[in-house]
From Swiss-Prot:
InterPro entries: Late_L2 (IPR000784)
GO biological process terms held by the UniProt record: microtubule-dependent intracellular transport of viral material towards nucleus; symbiont entry into host cell; viral penetration into host nucleus
Organism domain of life: Viruses
Name of the coding gene: L2
GO MF term (any one): structural molecule activity
Keywords, sorted A to Z: Capsid protein, Cytoplasmic inwards viral transport, Disulfide bond, DNA-binding, Host endosome, Host Golgi apparatus, Host nucleus, Host-virus interaction, Late protein, Microtubular inwards viral transport, Phosphoprotein, Viral penetration into host nucleus, Virion, Virus entry into host cell
UniProt name for this protein: Minor capsid protein L2
Family: Belongs to the papillomaviridae L2 protein family.
Any matching Pfam family: Late_protein_L2
Processing and modification events after translation: Highly phosphorylated.
Gene Ontology CC annotation, any one: host cell nucleus
Motif (Nuclear localization signal): 1-14, 454-462
Subcellular location: Virion; Host nucleus; Host early endosome; Host Golgi apparatus
Subunit structure and binding partners: Interacts with major capsid protein L1. Interacts with E2; this interaction inhibits E2 transcriptional activity but not the DNA replication function E2. Interacts with host GADD45GIP1. Interacts with host HSPA8; this interaction is required for L2 nuclear translocation. Interacts with host importins KPNB2 and KPNB3. Forms a complex with importin alpha2-beta1 heterodimers via interaction with the importin alpha2 adapter. Interacts with host DYNLT1; this interaction is essential for virus intracellular transport during entry.
Natural source organism: Human papillomavirus type 34
Length: 472
């Protein structure tokens, strides 16, 4: 048989305080009741002996008497309550003061005695003369009466402070409006300057030179950016030199065959679509699907035309092309300098001077006779000596083709030097009597001789020694 479950409810144990009251006198208390009620547990002992050297700031930690430790508790400062100041919202009116004398009656009459009206028909009026007269007091002074009015004392003080927020304040306009043009006349308006205080700040010009046609954005950036690097000579780029000059003009002929129906621009990026099986006219351009626009670079050997190509060597199932990049370049041949025959700018001399070993075919021929006396004169010129033959030609010589003098003394100038013969010839050289160019003795400019450029050295002082003079 299944045993019936015990439904006995366990009673709650009495609290430690209740057990302490009954078992303390009889001495039957459990060992944990007395220390718990008297505050003598292990935790209380730790806090009790530890609070001797540690101050917890009056937080009430522990089971002490609550005296605040050695220093005790510090009372909070108290302030004397003061009466709040009442500020009236509206100005107060002065009180109405009614003067009441000591002999006045306490009964206030609503109607004066002279205002009683007698009913009935009025009878004859009798005038009884009075034995006692009355005094009439008049004032001669015509000054108006001055009434003292008490001023209203108001203790309310109202102050207004205004602060300007520059974020929500419009700036002052300090420049005049632009001039207007109407019916062919130019109208200028006066300068409009506000009274607001302003500060003169030096302004800098950010854009120096700009072209209105080339401005695209509202704030163009001045200056030139450095040219971007092409990056044609990397490790992952194949370098291929193209010899065919058609690479410069029509590179499409090297990739595909000519299509007369379509001819695109050759200076832009070219894209090609190949079938599965194709053969390029040039084997270097096999599997090329894109040729970028040309770039001209300067090399040591000359100018180089470069194009960056993209290959499509492999295709995946998803249609993605895989291939490397190729740098095709073609070096342009240098242009040789043309040898141009130069013509002399100076007029030809009257005679052509050659060396002594040759025969001179001059511009003029002089027939020498037996009467001509030739004397040899040695003229020293620097380190070498030169023999100049001075010939005395008689006036009877015929067949002379020397050009005659034009009669004008033309100076060739200081920058043009005439050729002076330096070799020994059998003919007399034509040396002009006057200088070849004008010489200005008095002038503001001069040229120093190279020997004058040397800076003079500073002389070293030498001490003279004498027998009767002491030296230091």
């Amino acid at each position: 048989m299944r045993r019936k479950r015990d439904t006995h409810i366990r009673r709650k144990r009495a609290s430690a305080t209740q057990l302490y009251k009954t078992c303390k006198q009889s001495g039957t208390c459990p060992p944990d009741i007395i220390p718990k009620v008297e505050g003598n547990t292990l935790a209380d002992q730790i806090l009790k002996y530890g609070s001797i050297g540690v101050f917890f700031g009056g937080l009430g930690i522990g089971s002490g008497s609550g005296t605040g430790g050695r220093t005790g508790y510090v009372p909070l400062p108290t302030t004397t309550p003061s009466r709040p100041v009442e500020i009236p919202l509206q100005p107060t009116r002065p009180p109405v003061i009614t003067s009441v004398g000591a002999s006045d009656s306490s009964i206030v009459s609503l109607v004066e005695e002279s205002s009683f009206i007698e009913a009935g028909v009025p009878g004859p009026t009798s005038i009884v003369p009075s034995s006692s007269g009355f005094n009439v007091t008049t004032s001669v002074d015509s000054t108006p009466a001055i009434i003292d009015v008490a001023t209203i004392s108001d203790t309310t003080q109202v102050s207004v402070s205004t602060f300007n927020n520059p974020t929500f304040t419009d700036p002052s306009v300090l420049q005049p409006p632009p001039p207007l043009e109407a019916s062919g006349r130019l109208l200028f308006s006066n300068d409009t300057v506000t009274t607001h205080s302003y500060e003169n700040i030096p302004l800098d010009t950010f854009v120096v030179t700009t072209d209105n046609n080339s401005i695209v954005s509202s704030t163009p950036i001045p200056g030139r950016h450095p040219p971007a690097r092409l990056g044609l000579y990397g490790r992952a780029i194949q370098q291929v030199k193209v010899v065919d000059p058609a690479f410069v003009t029509t590179p499409t002929r090297l990739v595909t065959y000519d299509n007369p129906a379509f001819e695109g621009l050759q200076d832009t990026t070219l894209e090609f679509q190949h079938s599965d099986l194709h053969n390029a006219p040039d084997s270097d351009f096999l599997d090329i699907v894109k040729l970028h626009r040309p770039a001209l670079t300067a090399r040591k050997t000359g100018i180089r035309v470069s194009r960056l190509g993209q290959r499509a060597t492999m295709f995946t199932r998803s249609g993605k092309r895989i291939g490397g990049r190729v740098h095709f370049y073609h070096d342009l041949s240098p242009i040789p300098t043309e040898n141009i025959e130069l013509q002399p700018l100076l007029p030809s001399a009257s005679a052509t001077v050659t060396d002594a070993n040759g025969i001179n075919d001059g511009l003029y021929d002089v027939l020498l006779d037996n009467n001509v006396d030739i004397t040899e004169v040695e003229t020293p010129t620097g380190t070498n000596t030169q023999s100049v033959f001075a010939s005395e030609i008689s006036t009877t010589t015929a067949n002379t083709t020397i050009p005659l003098n034009a009669g004008l003394d033309t100076h060739p100038g200081p920058d043009i030097a005439l050729p002076v013969p330096t070799a020994e010839t059998i003919f007399t050289p034509t040396v002009p009597v006057q200088p070849s160019g004008p010489i200005y003795i008095y002038g503001s400019d001069f040229i120093l001789h190279p020997s004058l450029y040397v800076i003079p050295r500073k002389r070293k002082r030498l001490s003279y020694f004498f027998a009767d003079v002491a030296t230091y």
